Amino acid sequence: LNDVPHGDIRMEQYRSPVTGRIKACWVYTPPGYDHAHTESYPVLYLQHGVGENETGWIWQGKANLILDNLIAENKCRPILLVMNAGYAFLPDEDPTFFPGDYETELIHGCIPFIEQKYRVAAGRKNRAIAGLSLGSVQSFAIGMGHRDLFSRIGVFSGGFPISRPEYDYTALLQN
């Protein structure tokens, strides 16, 4: 643990538009967030891998400590980091592997909640999505399907999602 200013980790709860249940997400706010009352911040929505949950990037990945150090060394500007459980199953759905309708969960649940509660810089240029393993597949599919919402996509140890007829991957990657 380096002697640098540290941000905060906050657990938030909102009602899922997919399941109707209360859902938790974790939000990293950079050092000084609570004192910089007029500053707005870009957001990275960071997705976990299969078998993990919204706490994986904090407890295993130490994403908050990595950001603290990058910000202190001026290698990264202060951002908000949102880590959400990448699943959205209805009570009668089989949660064996696929994450349910997580796309709707993120786009119509988590993002509006975060943008209402936190000082988020407006527009797609200030919103990114990234993930590991299953989270990378989700990030790629959601990011490519909503290029009006996300300016950057990070894919870590993942692949292309299952074929979706609305995506012509070759054309999308060329754009």
Predicted regions and their residues:
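Non-catalytic cap/lid and distal C-terminal segments of serine-dependent acyl enzymes
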Residues: L1-N175
